[in-house]
Amino acid sequence: KDHILATGGNCEIVVGNSADLKIIKSLVQKAVDSFGKIDLVVANAGITTFGDFFEYQPESLRQLLDVNLFGSFFLVQEASKVMKEQQTGGSIVLTSSVTGHQAHPFLAAYGMTKAAIEQLAKNLVIDLSPLGININTVAPGATLTERTLEDKDYLSTWSRITPMGKPATVQDIAEAMIFLLSPQARHITGQSLVVDGGWTAVGVSPY
């Protein structure tokens, strides 16, 4: 927030569980109250859990489904209701993953949720296009974040197997989203923009 304000922007923060419909509704209402309207939506909340398929537990799956699917679905639904009333169109981006496109060891459950996000965006083209709202996904591959860098081998491993020689940065992912939210992408909808340095083209497993 400090960075946004320091660079001339404005923002509001709503803290809560992204899988809680009450929180989702309050977030959307806060945006309307603070800024007057909603033009752009990014559904970025998500969690990753690794696990052997044969050992995966119901509690872990429910948590994945709640955050990755329930939260994204109802954020888009609530925001789209506002955008529909405004009658001014808009753009929506959902965060997917390369695991929604391609099999990955130990990520069967996570990949399932991200494939569902991909299909959600495609299906919502039917509902949102008549309203002038486009909806797309960004599917990151290996990305350098505070969490991924906790693995001391992450950078070297993914640099070795990524055709472009390095993982993505957070900025790489953000700029892909900015493009899909921009007027330059106004006739793009129902698509997935994969940002993975070419990894899915060759599909070399890190394991």
Model segments located where?
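Short C-terminal tail/terminal secondary-structure segment
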Residues: 102, 178, 189-207
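Alpha-helical segment proximal to the catalytic Tyr-Lys
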Residues: 81, 85, 126-130, 186
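C-terminal helical subdomain
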Residues: 130, 137, 156-188, 195-197
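Active-site helix of classical SDR
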Residues: 76, 113, 121
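Substrate-binding pocket helix/loop in short-chain dehydrogenase/reductase
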Residues: 52-53, 60-65, 158
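Residue(s) in the substrate-gating loop at a strand-loop-helix junction
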Residues: 97
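Active-site loop immediately N-terminal to the catalytic Tyr-X3-Lys motif
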Residues: 53-54, 102-108, 130, 165, ...
